[in-house]
């Protein structure tokens, strides 16, 4: 019999393995394997215990704990929580309006009695609709709900009114176009009006236009004078023309073939 020490990777776990002389290698391997399993179980238990300890430590932080739904006692913490929750509430309301097209009105008073509101399209319009709906009597609501003919008549009247409004809009647009055209035409010939009827802006525009017209006339006159001088200067130069000489008739004399100077 001899004793051997079986040591796991963990330095704190060490077991003496007693081996008898008559034991075979298979028995020794089996005992070693069972010890290895024991060490692995102890290691897994220790790892699980470590994880539980770490999780318990994490739960101690405020961010990981579940906040109880009771009034916050400390005033500064209560004010900070109100600001954060109010911003989150308004953000969720805005998302609901954007996604679903809902009309929402929210009024919140802070612990310091300061009001904050959020509304789409506005708080006033939502409140007006709510108040007007509550002021409607039960008999009127039942009458509207119980008479389909009245609802159909109201829809027809609404359609007729909307069509009239659309026609009036078209007429208004046409009149606006006519007014703009009239103003444009009056602005084109505004200088034909008497000077006494012009305002300061029109007088300044007329002065500027006359100055520009004078510059244009002077420039054109200078160009015209230069062209005139060139033409008349060319005409003033004398051009000598050889005198006509009477020569006897004949083909050779007319075309001067005799001298070899014929010109066609």
UniProtKB/Swiss-Prot annotation:
Further comment: Plants lacking AGL61 show a reduced size of the central cell and a reduced or absent central cell vacuole. When fertilized, the central cell fails to give rise to endosperm and the embryo sac degenerates. However, mutated female gametophytesol are not defective in pollen tube guidance and the synergid function is not impaired.
Tissue expression remark: Expressed exclusively in the central cell of the female gametophyte and in early endosperm.
Protein name: Agamous-like MADS-box protein AGL61
Residues annotated as domain MADS-box: 62-122
Alphabetical UniProt keywords: DNA-binding, Nucleus, Transcription, Transcription regulation
InterPro entries: MEF2-like_N, TF_MADSbox, TF_MADSbox_sf
Quaternary structure note: Interacts with PHE1/AGL37, PHE2/AGL38, AGL80 and AGL86. Forms a heterodimer with AGL80.
The keyword Transcription regulation is assigned to this record: yes
UniProt xrefs under Gene3D superfamilies: 6.10.140.920, Transcription factor, MADS-box (3.40.1810.10)
Taxonomic path: Eukaryota, Viridiplantae, Streptophyta, Embryophyta, Tracheophyta
PANTHER family according to UniProt: AGAMOUS-LIKE MADS-BOX PROTEIN AGL61, MADS BOX PROTEIN
Annotated compartments: Nucleus
Gene that encodes it: AGL61
Organism encoding this protein: Arabidopsis thaliana (Mouse-ear cress)
GO process terms (BP): embryo sac central cell differentiation; positive regulation of transcription by RNA polymerase II
Role of this protein: Probable transcription factor. Controls central cell differentiation during female gametophyte development.
Domain of life: Eukaryota
GO cellular component: nucleus; polar nucleus
One GO MF term: RNA polymerase II transcription regulatory region sequence-specific DNA binding
């Amino acid at each position: 019999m001899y004793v051997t020490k079986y040591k796991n990777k963990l330095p704190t776990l060490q077991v003496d393995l007693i081996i008898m002389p008559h034991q075979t290698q298979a028995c020794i391997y089996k005992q070693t394997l069972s010890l290895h399993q024991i060490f692995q179980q102890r290691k897994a238990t220790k790892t699980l215990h470590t994880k539980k300890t770490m999780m318990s430590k994490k739960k101690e932080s405020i961010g990981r704990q579940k906040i109880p739904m009771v009034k916050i006692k400390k005033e500064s913490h209560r004010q900070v929580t109100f600001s954060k929750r109010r911003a989150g509430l308004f953000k969720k309301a805005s998302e609901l309006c954007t996604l679903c097209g809902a009309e929402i009105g929210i009024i919140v008073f802070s612990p310091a009695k300061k009001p904050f509101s959020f509304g789409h399209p506005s708080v006033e319009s939502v409140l007006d609709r709510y108040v007007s709906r509550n002021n409607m009597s039960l008999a009127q609501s039942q009458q509207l709900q119980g008479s389909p003919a009245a609802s159909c008549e109201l829809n027809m009247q609404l359609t007729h009114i909307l069509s009239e409004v659309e026609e009036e809009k078209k007429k208004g647009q046409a009149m606006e176009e006519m007014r703009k055209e009239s103003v444009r035409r009056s602005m084109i010939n505004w200088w034909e009006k008497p000077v006494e009827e012009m305002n300061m802006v029109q007088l300044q525009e007329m002065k500027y236009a006359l100055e520009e017209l004078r510059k244009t006339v002077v420039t054109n006159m200078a160009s015209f004078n230069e062209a005139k001088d060139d033409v008349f200067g060319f005409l003033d130069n004398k051009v000598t023309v050889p005198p006509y000489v009477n020569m006897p008739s004949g083909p050779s004399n007319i075309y001067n073939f005799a001298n070899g100077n014929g010109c066609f």
